[in-house]
């Protein structure tokens, strides 16, 4: 969770810097949203990879299925 918080802070600092330096606000906002979504997706995949017997659901767009050795279930596309 600390890595996620640190990553979000870094993304926000970079986003604000890009916003100040850029002339076109529309493009900057699209890039900021894309970066934040990518960070959230990576954090979600890192934290919620195993899904069998867990109360935490898989990330959006993923489903719980048997893993490679079928001992555990993993969130996969």
UniProtKB/Swiss-Prot annotation:
- Record carries keyword Hydrolase: no
Origin: domain of life: Eukaryota
| Localisation per UniProt entry | Secreted
* Molecular function GO labels: potassium channel regulator activity; sodium channel regulator activity; toxin activity
Query: Any chance you could tell me the propeptide residue ranges?
Result: 23-42
- Gene Ontology cellular-component terms listed: extracellular region
List the cysteine pairs that form cystine. 44-59, 51-64, 58-75
Tissue specificity: Expressed by the venom gland.
Residues making up the signal peptide according to the UniProt record:
1-22
This molecule's function is given as: Inhibits Kv11.1/KCNH2/ERG1, Kv1.1/KCNA1 and Kv1.3/KCNA3 voltage-gated potassium channels and Nav1.7/SCN9A voltage-gated sodium channels. In vivo, intracranial injection into mice causes lack of coordination for 10 minutes, followed by fast recovery.
Name the protein family. Answer: Belongs to the neurotoxin 02 (plectoxin) family. 04 (U16-lycotoxin) subfamily.
Write out the domain note.
The presence of a 'disulfide through disulfide knot' structurally defines this protein as a knottin.
Would you tell me the protein name for this molecule?
A: U11-hexatoxin-Mg1a
